[in-house]
């Protein structure tokens, strides 16, 4: 059963003159829009709280004073504060004057003209009903959506209702109540949403065998900025003919009109060709607005591309480039690019710190390990300061690290795989211990009770094993756990038991599941809490199968064919189409002999929940060592990165999250009134009074009579919304009716508007759906 957190949801009351698209002023509409359950409009054109914004959208002249608040007065006015006020200016007990508008029972002066909420002060939104519609103006050069810009004016966001202070059905509306949709737990139904690539392409040229990144590269919304409101790009490398170590082609694809579109691709040619088997990273590295991508080359250089796919710079040859990380190590606002052995200036690729580590270190991550407020460089067995000086070493070796505070004592642990001997290490800094480290675990065999002989003799899976670890709370006990893949299995180890010296190594396993990765035995994984219940699920792909495992016991919640020669890549989770739902992004390739009963896959695929029940998540995953606090959703790299392991609801690694508002949902309401100047028309204003955005394309039906009781849909209906509606935002839809039925025009037949009409299938859920219909009169008063 769907779980809804149903509280009374108040809604925005905005009394204003007609928008420019309707006419500067008019005296039309002799009745207020009403909800069938509300009992009519409140004083001041306010509506009541269940069925819509209520109230006439258009004002009338004031009449005599000395009236009773909330009652009609004069010639179409409403009494407010003992004064007969124009209907459009009445605001509870006040009568707004001059340029003021009524917003949630408060008279406010609209702020500056805006095209987006980012142009408004904090705590404000862009009210498009107060601005001008799109007029064909030229958008910025980076605009990819092809739309011109509408404008609005900044207004204060409505306050959130205090607990127990929600307005009653007929009370004045002063705040918005919490709006959340709670997905059903246990209903896990992934479906394929988008795909790019053909397993039968010539020379298997659509093969991908590296973890993609998700970042914003262009202005899809045409608001003049590239930010989290745009549709992110998926960036990845392909290779041809099985040559996964040479001549990679980088691609940027994105969802446009419900399908993948390739924005650009680039091949560097024979001079320093891109390495298609190495990781990439994305973010704003040069201080200029917009994001860049950094990749490794075959000759161990680093190449940077701008957002349009043009080369920005190419570094000098280095000791190694394997998994680039982007971070602002010296907190000067200009990020660095950190690769195995050196640190580069993000702006131009020049060397900032010379070689400081042997090139056989195959992965680095960044995190503040000693609590001094500055990021450190972390390998499987060493920690360095940002200037390249070593803080400590275990001497154990190892390949892939992750960071998390397993016992939540404020001292972070390094969880590392030792690939050569399929071992797991756990250690942390301790200035009072030998070599400055305390080794907590060093001999855990990640194969557990699985036999390496499940892989062919001599294969990587039979001898070695251990991919990049993840850190997350898999069993819901409030403490993070560790997980990683090997050649024959995927293992989750209990973080509390790992930190307990009395627990034998073999008893630290929470669970282990047999898998098949004999070729590399080093694949990674990612983590996400799809149902928002506080328990993480594992997303993992081996040579033939994409799996989603339940965190507590490893139950296989989902599996599907996904052929992959494997290196150290992993599937990841992000919102790639900006629909407010998490998506799984997985890569595959067809060059090898791996198949599923003859079937192969290749390229990039995106899976989502069939019923739209996965919770919200971020629209970014910018590097292999992603850990949330390392990047903002718009790709900005923080000058001072807060430690992930100290942040509420985090303390994880390679797990995407929505730290705040993961259950936030939209809530659409609607008002309706006639247009009486010029040709007759009906205008519906659709407003989102929820806490999450709703995509464009929501149908709005117009009816003569109640559609639930045989009402007739009017000609030209339904219309659809044309823009994403973020919380508090509205859009006006105009239904031209030059030949409107007589009963509609004279008011003898009530008019109705329904938002999300007929509830077509979509992946978003409102926190309530009983406020989507509104009734009004279509009659016009005689102009004075």
Q: Would you name each region that the model predicts?
A:
Residues 27-29, 85-86, 156-158, 606-612, ...:
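Short beta-strand-to-coil "C-cap" segments at the C-terminal boundary of structured domains/repeats
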Residues 21-84, 97, 102-104, 122, ...:
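Ser/Thr-rich, Pro/Gly/Ala-heavy low-complexity intrinsically disordered linkers and tails
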Residues 1-32:
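Sec-dependent N-terminal signal peptides
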Residues 660-784:
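Extracellular/luminal regions of secreted and cell-surface proteins that mediate adhesion/ECM remodeling
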Residues 67-71, 87-96, 111-120, 160-171, ...:
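Disulfide-bonded cysteine-rich modules in secreted/extracellular proteins
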Residues 64-66, 82-90, 106-115, 155-162, ...:
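Short domain-boundary/entry signatures in modular proteins, especially
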Residues 156-665:
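Extracytoplasmic/lumenal domain signature
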